[in-house]
Amino acid sequence: IPLSENPGFAKANNLALQQATGEFILFLNPDTIVAEDTFRQCISFFEQQYDVASVGVQMIDGSGTFLPESKRAFPSAAAAFFKLSGIAALFPHSPVFARYNLGHLSLDEIHRVDVLSGAFMMVRKTVLDITGGFDEAFFMYGEDIDLSYRLSKTKKNGTAYANYYLGTV
């Protein structure tokens, strides 16, 4: 989509979302390299689980290091305190002290999580139709937390939807 200016991550993705017609919508950063069968595995998970709002995958950086933003809890004052004070780093696998990055959850398994990264977030279109896309008040950063929150609060025909981290992908 040609744009004369940078409208920000949220607005740019929402412009694309307006033109999207697929059953699943993938928000993907342009510098992301995706393994060959990633999309197939994600779609298969959607088809097997009726309550999936969105899926994210195990993201790694160029040096092979796991990116903790792949799976997160909703931010809180306690999580910020534990991170800024260094307590989370002292106890990286604690469900209390390392709650924000969900350090107690295995990297290589499937988990229901609060927040997925906007760098790779595949979303069921029917759920996006209810929640709307990204909040354009966010120019960059935080918009994935907001959308993850709204997706996790969505209900339709008695189904409560959830966000899933696919550590196997």
Language model segments and positions:
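Glycine-rich, basic loop-to-helix element that forms the pyrophosphate-binding segment
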Residues: 2-20
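Hydrophobic/aromatic residue at the end of a short beta strand that borders the catalytic acidic motif
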Residues: 9, 28, 33-38, 61, ...
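Residue-level recognition of short loop/turn positions
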Residues: 21, 31, 63, 126-127, ...
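Short aromatic/hydrophobic "clamp" motif used to bind/position activated sugar donors
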Residues: 25
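Conserved donor NDP-sugar-binding/catalytic core segment of glycosyltransferases
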Residues: 33-70
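A short, conserved alpha-helix in the catalytic core of glycosyltransferases
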Residues: 106-168
